[in-house]
Each structure stands twice: as C-alpha cells, then as structure tokens.
Amino acid sequence: MEETSLFINFETLDLARVYLFGGVKYLDLLLVLSIIDVLTGVIKAWKFKKLRSRSAWFGYVRKLLNFFAVILANVIDTVLNLNGVLTFGTVLFYIANEGLSITENLAQIGVKIPSSITDRLQTIENEKEQSKNNADKAAG
C-alpha cells in the first residue's frame, strides 16, 4: 500500500532546479535579492502612498520573467554546449540589476547610502534618461 505524505520531496525539487536552471551558481542569491527588492519596493510605495495592486502585480510578473530569462539562457547554453557561461552571465546581470534596484529603493526610503554609491546611481540614471531622450528624438 502506497503512503501519501504532505511533506515536499526536496530531492525532486533539486532535480527540477538543476534541469531548469542548469545548477548555475548564485541562483539562490538572485532569489534572495529579488525578494528583498520586492519588499523594499513595497515599503517605498507605501511611504509615498503609491501602493497599487496593479503596479505591484506587474512588478511581480517582471521578477518571474527574470527567472524565465535564466531558464531560456540555460536552454540556449545546453543547445550550444557553452558549459553554463551564458546562464551564469544572465544570473550575474540580474543580480547586478537587483542590487541597483534595492539601493535605489533604500535611498528613496531614506536609508543613508554612501555618497560614492549614490553618485554612481545618479550617473546611471542620467545615462538612462539621455538614452531615452535620444531614442525619442530618433523616433519622432
């Protein structure tokens, strides 16, 4: 007689993780940073009274799509036999992105951030705005 258990078989989950993500390093860090980013984003929105469920859902979907991008990178990595280089690079990109987002959220919440970091964030924001303005001018 087969016994049913309510406990999760973590070995099966680990196999699924390796199959989907290729056992790439720092995936756990990306997950933790994504959760911290969501939490700091919610705190920031709450502080500025801009907490909207629709905006939050779009943010959650974006986070989920980041992990889909890692899965896609792993598939391409496997097909092209790149030994995990593309997947690792993709994870590092998203880790850097999450780190920037968390730092921006913390600065807007009012947490003291070293000036060297805030100066670099301001430079990145200015470059983003300049690129967007150039794209808008080119479009029309």
UniProtKB/Swiss-Prot annotation:
It holds the Pfam family Phage_holin_4_1. It is found in: Cell membrane. The chain crosses the membrane at residues 26-43, 64-86. Disulfide bonds: none annotated. GO terms for cellular component: plasma membrane. It comes from the Bacteria. Keywords: Cell membrane, Membrane, Transmembrane, Transmembrane helix. It is a multi-pass membrane protein. NCBIfam families: holin_tox_secr. Belongs to the bacteriophage holin family. Cp-1 holin subfamily. This is Uncharacterized protein YqxH.
